[in-house]
Structures are given as structure tokens and as C-alpha cells.
A protein has these predicted regions:
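N-terminal low-complexity, acidic/polar interaction/targeting segments
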Residues: 1-286
Length: 286
């Protein structure tokens, strides 16, 4: 099933939807200035709040989400019918069925319901599009028929246009990402293609934050950082640690193979020695 039928400018299809899977690779769209102006007129009082399990929505990224909770189903249908933006937040513990404020991370993203898909297995998948505004939950105002909250919008702090350090870090981040993606397979080819076609470093950070298989906790940590340069540094740090872990794993596997080969060689030699000794012993008896 294609995860996205709406076709905005500069979008890249990455993968198929998978229920409650944190490694879903979402569609990415570069959002126009109209998106930002819509957020400026957004009513931040009583904003409908959709809680996600093990998933973090980033500004400028669209993701498919399987929706099963009664409150969530009602929320997305109301939001689609009224063309109302919603607040999308990751919950701290995916096992909590009816999360309250303490069960949610404080920072989320203003989202839009792009499409609701009724699946053949009778489940519901919604395509969420992240707007270019993050928010912080101030107060929960309602819990029925679904959660609403008063929120404060938070701006993204962009680096200076001539920040050479930022440019160098973007280049290093791309190189590191390509290196990490080498062993993923066909999906990596599509992801590499998408990355190569993203010109905006701001969007690149959000795209990678959503696509790279980090934990929900790590992704939330990235989302919470308002300064894009600092977010980029943190993402690079996380990917560097991942690269180091992969190298350690590869070294262990290589050492294990060498040890096994050595054991096999020694075992073979011991068998040969025993065979020769047996033959010599037999000859002496003759």
C-alpha cells in the first residue's frame, strides 16, 4: 500500500506502513511559507492532542500512523472534517492506553490530517503532516471525548546564512549517514536519493531525525532542541555513536570468525596427528 496519495512539491516515497514500528521511514515534504502563516493564526487554546506510541513527528515530515484507540479515532475524524490542525506528541510509555499529561513528552509538533485510510484488515491508518511549528504543552483542558490542551508555540532558531561551521557539519552529517546506510539494502537507495535532493539543511535535520532508526527517546531529544545548529550537532553525535557501535559489533564478529577458524584448523590438525599416530602404531604392530 502506498502511504501517500497527496502529492505536494518535492516529496519522496520511502517505504510502506508498519503498525507501531518506530523505524517507519516517512514521506518528506518541503513546506511553503503558507504553512508558517497558518501556524501564526492557530488557536493555541484547547488544541486537540494526538498521542503517538514509539513515534515522533518532525516539522516538514509526513508519517503514516496506525490508529486504534477510540479517542484517537474520534480526534482524527473530527480534525479532518473541520480541517483543524492538531497537536502531535509522543507518549513516554507506549504501554499506557489512556495517557494523561504526565505520560506525554512536553514538546510536540503541530500536525495536519492529510488522509485517513481504512485498511483491508479493518484497521485505520492516518497520514500526518508536520507543520513548521513545535509547541509545548502548558495545561490539559479536556480529556473527553479526547485530550485538548493549551499550548505555547516554539520557534526554530536557524543558523546564520554564512555559518561555515554549520555548512561543514551538514556535509559531514550526510557523509556519515551514507556510510551508515550502506548495509540496509534497497530502502537505503531510496533514502540516499531523497537526502541528495534535499537542499535545505533545516529540512535535512528533520528528515534524518524521522528516518534514521533511533529510539523514540533519542528522536524526542532532537525535537526538543530549538536551535537547528545544536539539533544538528546532537544528531551527528548520535549517529557517530551508532557508527562506533556498529564498528565494535563488526570487530567482534570478525574476531569470532577468526577464533572459530583457528579452532577449526587446530581441530583438523589434531585429527590428522591422531590418524598418523594410529597408522604408525598399526605399522609397528605389523
Amino acid at each position: 500500500m502506498s502511504i501517500f496519495n497527496h502529492t505536494p512539491k518535492n516529496n519522496y516515497m520511502i517505504c510502506e506502513n508498519d503498525e507501531n514500528t518506530p523505524s517507519i521511514m516517512p514521506l518528506f515534504t518541503e513546506i511553503s511559507g503558507q504553512n508558517d502563516s497558518e501556524c501564526k493564526t492557530l488557536n493555541t487554546k484547547g488544541l486537540p492532542i494526538l498521542a503517538l506510541r514509539n513515534m515522533v513527528l518532525f516539522p516538514g515530515v509526513a508519517i503514516p500512523v496506525n490508529v486504534g484507540r477510540t479517542k484517537s479515532l474520534q480526534l482524527i475524524k473530527d480534525a479532518q472534517n473541520s480541517h483543524t490542525p492538531i497537536g502531535v506528541v509522543c507518549q513516554r510509555d507506549a504501554a499506557v492506553e489512556d495517557p494523561g499529561k504526565d505520560d506525554l513528552y512536553e514538546v510536540g509538533v503541530i500536525g495536519e490530517i492529510i488522509k485517513i485510510l481504512e485498511m483491508p484488515d479493518e484497521s485505520t491508518t492516518v497520514i500526518l503532516q508536520g507543520k513548521m511549528k513545535r509547541f509545548r504543552i502548558d495545561e490539559i483542558t479536556e480529556t473527553f471525548p479526547y485530550m485538548r490542551a493549551n499550548v505555547s508555540l516554539e520557534n526554530e532558531i536557524l543558523p546564520d546564512a554564512n555559518d561555515k561551521e554549520f555548512e561543514a557539519l551538514v556535509s559531514a552529517l550526510k557523509d556519515l549517514t551514507f556510510e551508515l546506510l550502506k548495509n540496509i539494502g534497497e530502502q537505503a537507495k531510496e533514502l540516499v536519493f531523497a537526502i541528495r535532493n534535499i537542499d535545505s539543511a533545516h529540512y535535512l535535520v528533520n528528515f534524518l531525525g524521522a528516518n534514521i532508526p533511533l529510539s523514540a527517546t533519542q528522536k524526542q531529544e532532537l525535537l526538543t532542541i530549538s536551535n537547528i545548529k545544536e539539533r544538528l550537532f546532537k544528531l551527528y553525535e548520535m549517529l557517530t555513536q551508532e557508527a562506533q557501535l556498529l564498528q565494535i559489533k563488526a570487530d567482534i564478529q570478525s574476531k569470532t570468525r577468526e577464533d572459530l577458524n583457528q579452532q577449526q584448523r587446530e581441530h583438523f590438525l589434531q585429527q590428522q596427528i591422531r590418524t598418523i599416530q594410529e597408522e604408525l602404531g598399526g605399522n609397528m604392530q605389523d
